[in-house]
Swiss-Prot record:
Signal peptide (UniProt feature, chain positions): 1-32
Family named by the database record: Belongs to the OpgD/OpgG family.
GO biological process terms held by the UniProt record: beta-glucan biosynthetic process
Coiled coil (residue ranges): none
Protein name per its UniProtKB record: Glucans biosynthesis protein D
Keyword Signal: yes
GO cellular component, one term: outer membrane-bounded periplasmic space
Pathway: Glycan metabolism; osmoregulated periplasmic glucan (OPG) biosynthesis
Cited Gene3D superfamilies: 2.70.98.10, Immunoglobulins
InterPro entries linked: Gal_mutarotase_sf_dom, GH-type_carb-bd, Glucan_biosyn_MdoD, Glucan_biosyn_MdoG/MdoD, Glucan_biosyn_MdoG_C, Ig-like_fold, Ig_E-set, TAT_signal
Locations listed in the record: Periplasm
UniProt GO MF annotations: carbohydrate binding; catalytic activity
């Protein structure tokens, strides 16, 4: 799965940005957008025209991988690339009075070879001008770039852009679009975490995964005092083209994105991923296999949350499996899903570099009927925090054929907590460890004679306390094995209940065990549903080894 290295290794995958379709679509006219850096021809622009462009482009052959960059850019190290800074004096909306938002651009170079085109749009006249690359827009500092190789190369374009919000208009960005169709945002902590994508193609098939590119962006000029702006994007790849509209609300404690896309299939697509997101889970309370560090937990996200079309809420803790796992959770018109980072306690991470306790959650809220399909989750084995190893997206049930046209509307919430939560009791944490002994005797004078794995799931909220006198019943379903020593424990420090059970194997199989549990009181569900996937060790590993040396 080396293709994942591209995400945190700063390698943008190739896709086409055919310049022939963009300039020819519009006619020249007057222009009045408040941008001092837009220097291209004046052209007309609107979203309907962008949709027509994407549809026309889908009927043409894909343009292929991006061309070579000048050597001085292609050979940059990550450290050298990061030292190239955009000159804030040339920001996109530097001339807008009382601006609350501003845009700066990323330089092409290193793995970011796609030459992305940028346009400034006057929202009153719907007229646009391209912003061409020129070295004076950047500060090269000690990057070692030979700027003489860049002179006159106005077609270099840019690698992406980022958004700044007052009072941090030139210091701390809140939104970033960089590499293929990747983008991300922060909450009020200003800490980036997981990423979203415009589209995912063939993520888990017998073929090569395809990474579409955003090849051009059009920015509606932000109004004075406004914290919301609109950006349009053209997406292109070997299999599909797309027209995207992002209305981005940079609020005080979160960033909200209203996304509308129109997709045009060039060819048959085995697996299409809508609203995809990419995250990292190395280790946590439930999975300690590769966590031999000073950090108790290392992850951008700790769970997949789903609000199904039938109203059921699901919590599915993430894993770092030894073998790649792909799970599809079937649904019909989902109400929402996302990868969440709900544990915000610094002491649970002890990380002063990654600040995982500050990383945002990402919640997808469909704004139209999506029909039948599945929330798909792929978990890739990883040895550490430098590689993203979790992918999640909506996969439509209907097969995508060449010539098909699709459209999706959804809202993305980048925030500490999702905008909605179950009114029932919710899963706070999942823990696993040695089983087969009474709680409070861990593990006693000697290890248990029979091997077992213990699971402890903490529930909070809802009507748990009111239900307790009537009787709380854990309803546990397992795909294999047996659940024994089931206990219900009230835990005063978090004012909730811990459901604890030991899993005992009933065969030598090492196939993943699908676990499902919810709480019931007098026949009624009183909690969201906990889903988990456990990977039993080989039979010869199902024993406890006492390695004490007593003399």
């Amino acid at each position: 799965m080396n293709r994942r290295r591209f995400i945190k290794g700063s390698m943008a995958m190739a896709a086409v940005c055919g310049s022939s379709g963009i300039a020819s679509l519009f006619s020249q006219a007057a222009f009045a957008a408040e941008s001092d850096i837009a220097d291209g021809k004046i052209v007309r622009f609107d979203f309907a025209g962008l949709q027509s462009m994407a549809q026309a482009l889908a009927k043409k052959p894909w343009g292929g991988a991006p061309g070579p960059l000048p050597d001085t850019l292609a050979n940059l190290t990550p450290q050298a690339y990061n030292s190239i800074q955009y000159d804030a004096a040339h920001s996109l909306w530097n001339g807008v009075a009382n601006r609350q938002l501003d845009i700066q651009f990323f330089h092409v170079g290193m793995g970011f070879r796609r030459r992305v085109r940028m346009f400034s749009v006057d929202t009153t006249t719907h007229l646009a001008r391209e912003i061409h690359f020129r070295p004076e827009l950047f500060k090269y500092n000690d990057a070692g770039v030979d700027t003489t190789q860049l002179e006159g190369q106005s077609d270099l374009g840019f690698a992406g852009f980022r958004v700044f919000k007052a009072p941090e208009l030139a210091r701390r960005d809140v939104v970033s679009f960089l590499g293929a169709s990747y983008f991300r945002a922060v909450d009020d902590t200003y800490q980036y975490g997981l990423s979203a994508r415009g589209l995912a193609i063939d993520t888990y098939t017998d073929g090569q995964e395809e990474f579409p590119d955003f090849t051009a962006f059009w920015f509606d000029t932000a109004k004075p005092g406004d914290t919301t702006f609109t950006v349009y994007a053209l997406l292109d790849s070997a299999s599909v083209t797309g027209a995207y509209k992002f209305v981005i609300h940079c609020e005080k404690t979160q960033v909200i994105m209203d996304v509308e896309n129109h997709l045009y299939a060039r060819k048959d697509i085995k697996q299409l991923g809508i609203a995809p997101m990419t995250s990292m889970f190395s280790c946590g309370n439930n999975e300690r296999r590769v966590c031999d560090t000073i950090h108790p937990q290392i992850h951008d996200s700790d769970r997949l949350a789903m609000w199904r079309g039938n109203g059921e809420w699901i919590c599915r803790p993430l894993n770092n499996p030894q073998k790649l796992q792909f799970n599809a959770y079937m649904d019909d018109n989902p109400k929402g899903f996302g990868l969440l980072q709900l544990d915000r306690d610094f002491s649970h991470y002890q990380d002063v570099m990654g600040w995982y306790n500050k990383r945002p959650s990402l919640w997808v809220e469909p704004r139209s009927k999506w029909g039948k399909g599945a929330v798909s989750l792929m978990e890739i084995p990883t040895t550490g925090e430098t590689l993203d190893n979790v992918v999640c997206f909506w996969q439509p049930e209907k097969a995508i054929k060449a010539g098909d046209t699709l459209a999706f509307n959804y809202r993305l919430y980048w925030s500490a907590q999702p905008p909605v939560q179950s009114p029932l009791a919710r899963v706070m944490a999942t823990r696993t460890g040695m089983g087969g002994f009474p709680e409070g005797w861990a593990p006693g004078e000697h290890y248990p004679d029979k091997w077992a794995r213990r699971f402890a799931i903490d529930f909070v909220g809802g009507d748990l306390k009111a239900a307790a006198p009537k009787g709380i019943e854990p309803v546990i379903t397992l795909s294999s094995g047996e659940a024994k020593q089931v206990e219900i424990l009230y835990v005063e420090p978090f004012d909730g209940y811990r459901i604890q059970f030991d899993w005992y194997p009933t065969s030598d199989s090492t196939a993943p065990v699908d676990m499902r549990m919810f709480l019931r009181c007098q026949g009624e569900a009183i909690s969201e549903t906990w889903l988990y996937q456990y990977f039993p060790p080989a039979p010869d590993k199902r024993r406890y080894v006492d390695d004490r040396i007593m003399r």
